[in-house]
Amino acid sequence: YAYYDCSCDSHSLFDDLAIAGDASYEKHLNKYYTIHLDITSFITGATNPDRIVDEMVERVTHDIKSEFPDVQYSKWNTLMDVLLAVATQKGRKFVMLIDEWDALCREASDKPKLLEQYINLLRNLFKGDNTNRVFAGVYMTGILPIKSYGTQSALNNFRMYSMINPEPIESFYGFTEKETKVLCKKFNLDYQELAHWYNGYQLGINRTKIFNPTSVMTVVTTGICKGYWTQTESFESVRDLINMNFDGVKEALESMLTQQPTKVTVSTFGNDSNVINSKDELFT
């Protein structure tokens, strides 16, 4: 969010990067108030698991009011009211970045009232009459599709980018071939070895090759190629699913390890990682 944040001058961070050559570079650089929310940190830091959403709103509201003490706030103290007061009185919009927006959906799947409260908060922020008056942009990362209740999506005004439908931003999902070759030349690494380990994605209609950026940068630091991703917490969850051997998952994986393709239908997956009805949903 350093690119958008108006509280600093970020030219030194971006002037020598490719983005500086874009026509809109100066248009958005350091032009907005920014809010970064890490939903996982709110979950782990909550004093009461049933008040995660309330505590998140209270903490963010407190921070905003502390940052803008001269703003006249209304008697309605919702987060949206506070943001609207700042945006209208200061004449500057917000850019909000929400990391792992779906963490609560995954961690509290057995608490429907808490989840509905969370979705209603997001709806109030991003699907209301004042949304465009407050936000210049909102970016949310997550594993699951936008959560729905009933037949209506809570946030159907968002554009979703996924591994299956990444266009036109697929080249930003990781390191491209060109970027990886530049790193290999700079740090004296074997490109072919990195390609063997980490170019596991071909995205979009152009089948753009994408390298895992975390793994590549770890090799830049250590000089050693190996499966770094398997040491992450996320892999533990995947391993548990594999060990269940649901609907022949183990056999399908063994087939893929011997270079045999396995067909997977990804379009049927909903938005609940705790409800797996088929091998296709598990792989997705």
Regions flagged by a language model, labelled:
Residues Y1-T284:
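Phosphate-binding site recognition
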